[in-house]
Amino acid sequence: VTYSLHPGAEQDIADALDFYSERAGQLVAQRFLDEFERVAKLLVAHPELGTPSTKGRRLFPLRVFPYSVVYRSLETGIRIIVVRHQHRKPNYGGARL
């Protein structure tokens, strides 16, 4: 059981890493990535943890950073569709499948 990333989610993560790297340094960017990986592994193990949303999706917040992971449960694991900032564009990534 594992997770896969929508190409848009890959870009969301890259954008967040660029932002934190430029504004706060590599250490903070690495902490963001570590926190994302922690949440992704947690959701693979317990896909029911996220708050139910639309289109069969679930949302789960990162603990330290103002981002939420939007994902869908699959038989083989989870598909991460969006990594969305919690204070910007509440419908961001909504059209992704």
Please report, for each region that a protein language model flagged, where it lies by residue:
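Short hydrophobic/aromatic beta-strand element in the GNAT-like acyltransferase core
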Residues: R57-L59, S68-V69
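Basic, Lys/Arg-enriched alpha-helical interface segments
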Residues: V1-R57, L74-G77, R96-L97
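A short, glycine/Asx- and small/polar-enriched loop/turn
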Residues: R63-F65
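Enriched for short, Lys/Arg-rich terminal
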Residues: Q26, S68, R72-L97
